[in-house]
Amino acid sequence: MTLEAIRYSPGSLQILDQLQLPEHCHYEALSSVQQASEAIRAMKVRGAPAIALVGCLSLAVELRAGAGGPGLAALVAFVRDQLRLLVAARPTAVNMARAARDLGQVAAQEAEREGATEETVRERVIRFAEDMLEKDLKDNRSIGDLGARHLLEQTNPRGGKVTVLTHCNTGALATAGYGTALGVIRSLHEMGRLEHTFCTETRPYNQGARLTAFELVYEQIPATLITDSMAAAAMAHRGVSAVVVGADRVVANGDTANKIGTYQLAIVAKHHGVPFYVAAPSSSCDLHLETGKEIVIEERPSQELTDLNGVRIAAQGIRVWNPAFDVTPHELITGGIITELGVFAPEELRGALSASVFSEGQTLDSPWV
């Protein structure tokens, strides 16, 4: 049985409440964009691709129930307002913003078509949102295959096995299924070329310990959990062949926003001569921004750092800085950026993706919503 972060059928959306993992597998029904926004903000669902999918599918559920209108203009305005609410839930990940732009345009274009009705606008937006599920899974499979083959060519072309270190959670729980960085690891395992996986606990939210370790055990992939502070020692003494991480936003020059702690992993990897890869769909690539300095970094509540399962573990009165993400400079991404379209050096990204990512009249100046 495959792990599912999202269960969807027309008119019905359920998410696996990831706050309850690994102790309990509980699915929560979402019937509105407001509920989806709250679930995203609370991190019941997380991972840039999954956030976009849940957001758009929650809108599809609302529209199928007849929300929006009356009138075409009011319906298009409703769609755009709901999309803005979803984008604001967690602003660092670009996938939701890109999906909001696309869905908003789909609604507006359909409304302008001769003979358009509220029903045709709803159907067009719903169909677009539902198609995202299939596309994300297909893209993940491509990322896994392309990334695994490139990694093997660069690190062990003679046919041996490799050991990979990863950070946070980038598997089936963060996507429509299979995963991005964890998809590369899964592909290596399926090819019989994976020796071992090291996954970091990923403090302070412990996505690695709670979610990635859960997926690896579930899929029977050989793995060891380490603390974040053990990564350098693992690279020095445990034969790490490559580091593969995901991304919440990759900008035009290749700078990458990902879970806090990614930046220091890239520095350590470069010191040890270990190739450092970013695995992300093209929907996570934001060519509107030139460098990582322009990325808005979400900051999380202090309690996520000072409390554990409701128990205070830090001194009262201590100040807390709790950014959810950091930005890895492109020059530290030495292995490449793995997308469903190929594996690219950071400096190749803009040219390689421009025609594909910004198709159908989109430009670098096109607004997200």
From Swiss-Prot:
Keywords: Acetylation, Amino-acid biosynthesis, Cytoplasm, Isomerase, Methionine biosynthesis, Methylation, Nucleus, Phosphoprotein. One of its GO terms (cellular component) is nucleoplasm. InterPro entries: IF-2B-related, IF-M1Pi, IF_2B-like_C, Initiation_fac_2B_a/b/d, M1Pi_N, NagB/RpiA_transferase-like. One of its GO terms (molecular function) is S-methyl-5-thioribose-1-phosphate isomerase activity. The modification Phosphoserine is found at S366. Pathway: Amino-acid biosynthesis; L-methionine biosynthesis via salvage pathway; L-methionine from S-methyl-5-thio-alpha-D-ribose 1-phosphate: step 1/6. The keyword Nucleus applies. SUPFAM superfamilies: NagB/RpiA/CoA transferase-like (SSF100950). It catalyses: 5-(methylsulfanyl)-alpha-D-ribose 1-phosphate = 5-(methylsulfanyl)-D-ribulose 1-phosphate. It is found in: Cytoplasm; Nucleus. The active site is at D248 (proton donor). The modification N-acetylmethionine is found at M1. The record marks C168 as: Transition state stabilizer. It comes from the Eukaryota. Catalyzes the interconversion of methylthioribose-1-phosphate (MTR-1-P) into methylthioribulose-1-phosphate (MTRu-1-P). Belongs to the eIF-2B alpha/beta/delta subunits family. MtnA subfamily. This is Methylthioribose-1-phosphate isomerase.
